[in-house]
């Protein structure tokens, strides 16, 4: 079975009170539409067709990709009209219709729905609700067959008592779709062409309307305002927390933990409160992450410890290494096995060898640090000359005294030492001491200034 997917994403979202198109509002660091596209791709369709309207340029700019076909709906005349705009591009046997503001839909749910489709049967995703206000109602005949969907505003009191709601998500045999869309009318309370009207047409044409339901009603929850958006965010985060805990992660408080990307975890990982994981993060076995940390696009090898209030981005932390508290590792930072980065240390494009130590109050940028080298407090690499970046290279077993300025490009070779307070501008040979500071003078008879009285 070949598959085309149509994603409706043309709505304005006035209740968001935002210049940003509704479908671009984020859930867990990705736009709502981005989540839907991600799910659609996992179904391996022949084509993904995104119907856009309000804020079309912004949607294209943020989400443009070779596998997406953007279709313009100039006037928002209803869901049926929106799907009709994509008709000329549809070539597959089956068409699945999704919504750009329903980001939590699970691929497993969509797969079950697609299994219900054949040339004489379409699949409709419905949901059981305690309060179906606002949802179209699923109308069944005396044999429990779906015969129509009635929108809430058009429903009678008896129909409003129905608790089975329409999610809007359906999969249909493509051979019938053009005919059904061509027969739609806008003779309703909204004056729109409802996609839901094709259900009654299908039933009247003798097709079976087979229904599926999500395991979790929040899968089909959309967001029309900021409150609903926050509810989707919290539900997504709790879902991710449950997934990670099932994989062997201890979360001190699942309600105070956020995932905003893709996280791969090992076993016996401990994550404290207020930790944010962004982008692609790999966390191997026995890692400990302290409170209030942000980790983005990074890999933490087995046994890594990240202490409180650290920010790690684009970094690789080797087995048994540690960072923090209050450490900042910027993109390109690599810690070798058992390397140590302490409090108020910032690394950028710096490679620390196995067992290297940078204890505190240090900046290392564009630097190669050898194994077992120790960097004293207050050391900085002066790597930028105002136009270009330059590299600092320290060999193995180097000892850098406190309050050093290492003016790049400079090499300090194996076993060398630099004296505290030095400004190193020349290479230091192996096993030698580099001293680059003014000689101290003690002035005999010097008197400390006395404060002048204002009287």
Curated annotation (Swiss-Prot):
Function in brief: Catalyzes the last two sequential reactions in the de novo biosynthetic pathway for UDP-N-acetylglucosamine (UDP-GlcNAc). The C-terminal domain catalyzes the transfer of acetyl group from acetyl coenzyme A to glucosamine-1-phosphate (GlcN-1-P) to produce N-acetylglucosamine-1-phosphate (GlcNAc-1-P), which is converted into UDP-GlcNAc by the transfer of uridine 5-monophosphate (from uridine 5-triphosphate), a reaction catalyzed by the N-terminal domain.
GO cellular component labels: cytoplasm; membrane
- What are the entry keywords? Acyltransferase, Cell shape, Cell wall biogenesis/degradation, Cytoplasm, Magnesium, Metal-binding, Multifunctional enzyme, Nucleotidyltransferase, Peptidoglycan synthesis, Repeat, Transferase
The UniProt catalytic activity note for this protein reads:
alpha-D-glucosamine 1-phosphate + acetyl-CoA = N-acetyl-alpha-D-glucosamine 1-phosphate + CoA + H(+); N-acetyl-alpha-D-glucosamine 1-phosphate + UTP + H(+) = UDP-N-acetyl-alpha-D-glucosamine + diphosphate
Q: Which GO terms fall under biological process for this protein?
A: cell morphogenesis; cell wall organization; lipid A biosynthetic process; peptidoglycan biosynthetic process; regulation of cell shape; UDP-N-acetylglucosamine biosynthetic process
Gene, per the UniProt record: glmU
**Where's it found, cell-wise?**
Cytoplasm
Species: Pseudomonas syringae pv. syringae (strain B728a)
Pyrophosphorylase: annotated segments = 1-226
Could you tell me what this protein is called? Bifunctional protein GlmU
The segments labelled N-acetyltransferase in the record are 248-455
Kindly name one Pfam family recorded for this protein.
Hexapep
Gene3D superfamilies tied to this protein? Hexapeptide repeat proteins, Spore Coat Polysaccharide Biosynthesis Protein SpsA, Chain A
Query: Which EC class, in a word?
Result: transferase
Q: How does it assemble?
A: Homotrimer.
Task: Give the family from UniProt.
Answer: In the N-terminal section; belongs to the N-acetylglucosamine-1-phosphate uridyltransferase family. In the C-terminal section; belongs to the transferase hexapeptide repeat family.
The cofactor named in the record is:
Mg(2+)
Q: Which CDD domains match?
A: GT2_GlmU_N_bac, LbH_GlmU_C
Binding positions for Mg(2+)? 101, 224
